[in-house]
Amino acid sequence: MNDIADRLRQRTFDFALGVIGFCRQLPDSWVERELGKQLLRAGMGVAGNYWSACRGRSDKEFIAKLGVATDEADESVLWLTAFERSGIGPATDGKSLLGEGNELRAILAKSHKTARENRQKKKREARRSRPPAHSPTL
């Protein structure tokens, strides 16, 4: 794994820890519990799916897991925005998490797009380098 991937692994993990800390500070009422569960799943999913992508056994698996991590980051931003706009939860932690969630979402989305493009490029190059199929002669 390279340095960039290692740093992103750490950022996704730190984001997940931030989400845990945020959820622990929520008031103990039904609405906050339900919203907190959704945020917790999505926030942990960013790290879990990115880490899984890094262990991918194939380009296809890497791209799929990276796409899921991107979706989880997007969902985390949704829940954090809902907390911010409704005035639920610790405001300062929510704002910093929202900023980090937006950054992670952008990084993961761009990485996902680049990985898909690179895979398509490899496929095209592989097709071009194959010798033409011989037609049977009768």
Regions found by a protein language model. Name each.
Residues 1-138:
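Amphipathic alpha-helical assembly/interaction segments
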